[in-house]
Every structure is written in C-alpha cells, then in structure tokens.
C-alpha cells in the first residue's frame, strides 16, 4: 500500500499546538519533532569564526513541507544569532529567502557577505 504525503499525520501541529523548536548547542542544530520523535525537521549550523556562525542547511521531510515549519527553524536560528551577538553567514538558500521576506534590522545588521 502506497502512502501519500497528505496521509502523514502531523502530530502536535495537527492538533493546533504551536510548533516547538529545540536548540541542541552541542550538535549545533535546531529541530522540530513532527510525529512523536520519529520524524523531525532540522536546521544545521557551524561556527566558522570566534563569533561567526554559518547557517548551513534546513531540511523538512517531504510529507511536512509547505506547513511553515522551516520558517520557525529560520526564525529560531536568526534570533539565536541576535541574542548571542553573533554574525551569520547564510549558506542555506532557505534562510537567505527568509531574510529577504523578513528584512528585520536586527537580522540584516548581523549578516556576513
């Protein structure tokens, strides 16, 4: 039996609960658990200087795309950059897109070319 993307339950999101982003500083990633603890969306980053992070990659499983999950990951990562007084290099195309759509001064002033 084939499973379609629409048939995948969304767990807490489906029940109207807010999306909860977790930050694992040791692994340098932000995650959202999607279906209990089995599926997750992730944003990966690395320190590339003393106070510079590279926001490298955002991945949301196909079945969960288009539901605003990546936006929550991007916001959490950029808020982390602001709160920790860091600079950010945006390797990830999605985060580049997010900043263009949300050109907040506190984000823009922290971007590295």
UniProtKB/Swiss-Prot annotation:
Residues 22-112 form the N-acetyltransferase domain. It comes from the Eukaryota. SUPFAM superfamilies: Acyl-CoA N-acyltransferases (Nat). Pfam families: Acetyltransf_CG. Belongs to the NATD1 family. This is Protein NATD1. It comes from Homo sapiens. The lineage of its organism: Eukaryota, Metazoa, Chordata, Craniata, Vertebrata.
């Amino acid at each position: 039996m084939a499973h379609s993307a629409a048939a995948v339950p969304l767990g807490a999101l489906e029940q109207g609960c807010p999306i909860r982003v977790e930050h694992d500083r040791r692994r340098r990633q932000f995650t959202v658990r999607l279906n209990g603890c089995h599926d997750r969306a992730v944003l990966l980053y690395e320190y590339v200087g003393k106070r510079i992070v590279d926001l490298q990659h955002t991945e949301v499983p196909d079945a969960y795309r288009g539901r605003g999950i990546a936006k929550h990951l991007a916001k959490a990562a950029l808020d982390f950059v602001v709160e920790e007084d860091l600079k950010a290099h945006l390797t990830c195309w999605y985060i580049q897109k997010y900043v263009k759509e949300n050109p907040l001064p506190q984000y823009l002033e922290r971007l590295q070319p």
